[in-house]
């Protein structure tokens, strides 16, 4: 999601050929990625200084046996090199360390100072005060 003069959605194939956008190098990940990649534009003053990237969730269990059709960790590395902050959002009930999760963490290595971790749905746990 990024600032734009009008609200809309730009498909990945159009993003990588637009010389005004920074996404040209993502074309190396092929059509399987570009068909899933898109950018929403919103005319909001908040977005004049930031862009927000939301990646698909990490696959776990049987789902991780399904091939995404593109190099997911390569895409993570590409964005990690260019962003100021990486927010990892986890469901506190499903802290599964799958093979894809491990590869994703490896892809983010070297960007530790940018990473913040948020545990979602923590309110469902009862905490004991020590």
Features from the language model and the residues they span:
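Switch- and interface-adjacent substructures of P-loop NTPase systems
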Residues: 1-116, 125-126
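GTPase G-domain guanine-specificity segment
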Residues: 122-130
């Amino acid at each position: 999601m990024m600032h734009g003069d009008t609200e809309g959605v730009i498909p990945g194939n159009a993003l990588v050929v637009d010389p005004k956008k920074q996404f040209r190098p993502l074309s190396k990940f092929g059509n399987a990625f570009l068909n899933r990649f898109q950018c929403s534009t919103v005319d909001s003053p908040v977005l004049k200084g930031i862009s927000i990237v939301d990646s698909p969730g990490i696959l776990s269990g049987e789902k991780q046996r399904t091939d995404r059709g593109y190099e997911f960790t390569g895409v993570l590395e590409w964005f990690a090199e260019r962003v100021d902050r990486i927010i990892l959002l986890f469901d506190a009930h499903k802290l599964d360390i799958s093979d894809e999760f491990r590869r994703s963490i490896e892809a983010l290595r070297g960007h530790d100072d940018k990473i913040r971790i948020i545990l979602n749905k923590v309110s469902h746990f009862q905490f004991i005060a020590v």
